[in-house]
Amino acid sequence: MAHKKGQGSTQNNRDSAGRRLGVKKFGSEFVRAGNIIVRQRGTKMHPGNNVGMGKDHTLYALTDGVVKFEYKDKSRKKVSVISQNFGE
């Protein structure tokens, strides 16, 4: 006969912390070069103009400007940064 009982509930009650994914800067929001715009797993959104992609598919701004979300085609989303020349 086993002399330990009730172990299942204590061994199974674990979970990993959330990964804090998602959009960090929203449409028409001002960003500086290097700001993270979207954290994602895989390319749910693709980089557009003035946006770079890291090795973990993070999208970030390459220049200062305003974020714009648009569709590349019917199914694929694209994120761009519209740079603004302030009185130059």
From Swiss-Prot:
GO terms for cellular component: cytosolic large ribosomal subunit. Keywords: Ribonucleoprotein, Ribosomal protein. Gene3D superfamilies: 2.40.50.100. InterPro entries: Ribosomal_bL27 (IPR001684), Ribosomal_bL27_CS (IPR018261). Residues 1-21 are annotated as: Disordered. Signal peptide: none annotated. GO terms for biological process: translation. One of its GO terms (molecular function) is structural constituent of ribosome. HAMAP family: Ribosomal_bL27 (MF_00539). Belongs to the bacterial ribosomal protein bL27 family. PANTHER family: LARGE RIBOSOMAL SUBUNIT PROTEIN BL27M (PTHR15893:SF0), RIBOSOMAL PROTEIN L27 (PTHR15893). This is Large ribosomal subunit protein bL27. It comes from Helicobacter acinonychis (strain Sheeba). The gene is rpmA.
